[in-house]
A protein has these predicted regions:
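TPR/TPR-like (Sel1-like) alpha-helical repeat modules
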Residues: 48-52, 66-69, 73-79, 122-126, ...
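Conserved small-residue packing positions in alpha-helical repeats and bundles
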Residues: 14-18, 48, 55, 103, ...
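Terminal, low-structured helical/coil segments at or just beyond the last alpha-helical repeat
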Residues: 3-5, 183-218
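TPR-adjacent "capping" and linker segments in tetratricopeptide-repeat scaffold/adaptor proteins
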Residues: 1-20, 30-35, 72, 85-92
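Structural signature of tandem alpha-helical TPR/SEL1-like repeats
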Residues: 20-28, 56-84, 108-120, 142-150, ...
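Generic helix N-cap/helix-start motif at coil->alpha-helix transitions
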Residues: 4-12, 22-24, 39-42, 58-63, ...
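Solenoid-like repeat scaffolds
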Residues: 31-38, 86-91, 108, 119-125, ...
């Protein structure tokens, strides 16, 4: 329910032309950066902050002086603004980070759609960074089984960042599946630079061992 509108505008001020121009120049610069690299996380976050703040501040007609939004409406307006930005950037065939943001926004209301977006993101990024972020996002949402499924379906341990392995092992531990976590840990044997991941493997091995001991003692 929208709060009653006040007829008074005492103390209300519109953004100055200089302020609007500064915002526009910053936004244009960020959009240019994202056009060059649609997976520039810092640029996306900065632009998302601009568009979400603008959406939350403005009334339904885009004029900040015509009405006030309650907190839930502000959040919805901000989320819709970021959603529109993500959709715009996701049209680039090189873009995977915007797809992850879209999945984050939709995972509660459109579970299958979110998983589909994460799968597309993983397919667009041969390095595995998108896959690791997608698995982490699902873990944060409490969807450990879906996180494991995404990882199993797309991980190439010999070619991709070992961070994917970390996320899959942790997802299996989140799901109280230490034996499965151990199997995924073994997949890191395929990574060509074993010296580079020695610390990671030791860290994950300790986590798996602790989980096994916990289950054995239960």
């Amino acid at each position: 329910m929208r709060r009653p509108l006040s007829a008074s505008r005492v103390g209300s001020t519109r953004p100055t032309k200089t302020a609007r121009r500064g915002d526009t120049l910053h936004e244009d610069a960020l959009r240019s950066m994202l056009n060059d690299d649609p997976n520039n996380v810092r640029a996306f976050q900065a632009l998302a902050a601009i568009v979400s703040r603008r959406a939350a501040e403005n009334g339904p007609d885009g004029d900040p002086l015509t009405g006030a939004l309650d907190p839930s409406e502000k959040q919805r307006a901000a989320d819709l603004a970021v959603w529109s930005l993500g959709e715009e950037l996701a049209g680039n065939p090189r873009a995977w980070h915007p797809l992850i943001e879209l999945a984050r926004l939709s995972v509660q209301d459109d579970h299958e759609g979110a998983l589909r977006r994460l799968a597309i993101a993983a397919e667009r990024d041969p390095s595995g960074e998108a896959l690791a972020e997608g698995i982490a996002m699902l873990r944060d949402a409490g969807l450990s089984s879906e996180a494991i499924g995404l990882g199993i379906g797309h991980w190439r341990p010999k070619e991709q960042t070992p961070e994917v392995g970390r996320q899959i092992v942790q997802a299996a531990l989140d799901a109280d599946r230490p034996l499965e976590a151990k199997q995924h840990l073994r997949s890191l044997d395929l990574y060509p630079d074993q010296a580079a991941i020695a610390d990671l493997r030791a860290e994950l091995a300790r986590a798996v061992a602790q989980a096994e001991q916990h289950i054995a003692g239960a």
